Amino acid sequence: MASRLPTAWSCEPVNFEDVTLGFTPEEWGLLDLKQKSLYREVMLENYRNLVSVEHQLSKPDVVSQLEEAEDFWPVERGIPQDTIPEYSELQLDPKLDPLPAESPLMNIEVVEVLTLNQEVAGPRNAQIQALYAEDGSLSPDAPSEEVQQQGKHPGDPEAARQRFRQFRYKDMTGPREALDQLRQLCHQWLQPEARSKEQILELLVLEQFLGALPVKLRTWVESQHPENCQEVVALVEGVTWISEEEVLPAGQPAEGTTCCLEVTAQQEEKQEDAAICPVTVLSEEPVTFQDVAVDFSREEWGLLGPTQRTEYRDVMLETFGHLVSVGWETTLENKELAPNSDIPQEEPAPSLKVQESSRDCTLSSTLEDTLQGGVQEVQETVLKQVESAKEKDLPQKKHFDNHESQANSGTLDTNQVSLQKIDSVESQVNNGALNTNQVLLQKIPPRKQLRKCDSQVKSMKHNSRVKIHQKSYERQKAKEGNGCRKTFSRSAKQITFIRIHKGSQVCRCSECGKIFRNPRYFSVHKKIHTGERPYVCQACGKGFVQSSSLTQHQRVHSGERPFECHECGRTFNDRSAISQHLRTHTGAKPYKCQDCGKAFRQSSHLIRHQRTHTGERPYACNKCGKAFTQSSHLIGHQRTHNRTKRKKKQPTS
């Protein structure tokens, strides 16, 4: 059956056929007396609703017949006479339908019952719709599974939002149906009858803001179920476990970092599902220059300065040199080996082409602008360095300056480059047996393509996996002291990983043994042991370790409370305070005890609760030695000593 439901945007007058439910003779025969009685009540109620809103319509004969009979359904509609024998002789007015043998109800094909008074008719309409849910074979034109899914939870705004975002035009029969469906889903999501314009705008901005966050941060924020933008801002500002580089938008390199080593969030999403290749099973597929290069879109390229672009060009040349040094094939179209070349050739690799691409993140378009000459210049540059190295008679030196430094630091294996193979190729170049382009076609078996460290046997292909490994390695490095046999398929990614082994990102406190990833956090922590408080309040002379703490303290004197709760209007002078307060409205308890499962809104409450499991009492009285789990309990206990001391000093009367 086809649905003809009037929508809130329709300007056409509503008639009785638009709000009625029709049954075929087969469907009517499956209904019992109770269901038929329910049908009669709903039909009469729909008619009364139309009359109540002053719709000028004449009473249909169907309504008159329903008012006169408890279970009216004539024989002409295909129902056996024995079900309603007392009305078997009743005839219909032929003016109601061009087919005298059929009732007007036979031409009404409506799946759902829609009334103007939803509060009254809603429960009864649901009972009518339940008839279809009990038996999906009632009608051969029953709605598809997708339409049934869309009918579930019609009042759930989140479900309506997801269906609105996942809407596909191809699922509709035409543009009018598609537009009506979109309007209905949007109406269910935004609920304009219950929300103001400001609240609707807040919902739209909230969705867009969440989509603009980095993937890792957005996943965590959505798990907290924020209801508005203020809660999202408070959550993001309170995040301390994510690095500054991960928070920066894609295409905006952090200060002091090498732009060529950055991989955008869009690339990480595309590469997230890529497989990790073990070291023992090396890929046999030929590798091209695009497989080991770092890509920038045109928008990202526009954000780079001249120095960063020059650095990018140098690294791309260096990466190409690495390919040549280990014998990877990079071919140019329309270039073939000379007929007199007697060097055995293996299966050729895919050609390296520099051309425009329709992808958002493309290497070829940017590389063409950057290298200013394409692959030909890169090849000539590499060959010049090879010839220069030979003229200086330094057979043990790599063809690039940074190779030596990397070999000394242990990041590159000296066996990765087959110098004998390169010398033989150079001799053929000098003898005229090979031209410069043919040198690049000589292939050394790509068994040396991956760079290793020392202890673990893994392979990493993407920057996101490098970062994950960095964090796990930093936690274990101080305890184990061993190297890492992590393997990478991209030399640029390996350079990023080398920083871990230098120890620049791991800082251990000599006083308490605490480890910090960020040197700035470590410098702040050291002031706790030294007692240094360089930031002093001019009003009261109180000192602080951090400038942010001083700024927060100064609001006590000025009375400034810039953070306001949108729910109750309460104001706060600190971000962390409003973040904790918002949890009282949302009911979020993110800190959960691993022993008993009890959850808390604040981490300090969880720490205090865990002492009931461990029995720890860190606050001890220096006079009697009694220990307490909370500092407030210790302060209250110390007052008993002070009162006793004062009583002893008072003279007896």
From Swiss-Prot:
Its main location: cytoplasm. InterPro entries: KRAB (IPR001909), KRAB_dom_sf (IPR036051), SCAN_dom (IPR003309), SCAN_sf (IPR038269), Znf_C2H2_sf (IPR036236), Znf_C2H2_type (IPR013087). The keyword Isomerase does not apply. Residues 388-404, 471-483 have a biased composition (Basic and acidic residues). The keyword Nucleus applies. GO terms for biological process: chromatin remodeling. Residues 459-470, 636-653 have a biased composition (Basic residues). Residues 136-159, 339-359, 388-414, 456-485, 632-653 are annotated as: Disordered. Keywords: Cytoplasm, DNA-binding, Metal-binding, Nucleus, Repeat, Repressor, Transcription, Transcription regulation, Zinc, Zinc-finger. SUPFAM superfamilies: beta-beta-alpha zinc fingers, KRAB domain (Kruppel-associated box), Retrovirus capsid dimerization domain-like. It is found in: Cytoplasm; Nucleus, Nucleolus. A zinc finger (C2H2-type) spans 507-529, 535-557, 563-585, 591-613, 619-641. Residues 161-243 form the SCAN box domain. Residues 14-85, 287-360 form the KRAB domain. Residues 405-414 have a biased composition (Polar residues). It holds the Pfam family KRAB. One of its GO terms (cellular component) is cytoplasm. One of its GO terms (molecular function) is RNA polymerase II transcription regulatory region sequence-specific DNA binding. Belongs to the krueppel C2H2-type zinc-finger protein family. Probable transcription repressor. Specifically binds to the 3'-end of zinc-finger coding genes and recruiting chromatin-modifying proteins such as SETDB1 and TRIM28/KAP1, leading to transcription repression. The SETDB1-TRIM28-ZNF274 complex may play a role in recruiting ATRX to the 3'-exons of zinc-finger coding genes with atypical chromatin signatures to establish or maintain/protect H3K9me3 at these transcriptionally active regions. Interacts with SETDB1 and TRIM28/KAP1. Interacts with ATRX. Forms a complex with ATRX, SETDB1 and TRIM28. This is Neurotrophin receptor-interacting factor homolog. It comes from Macaca fascicularis.
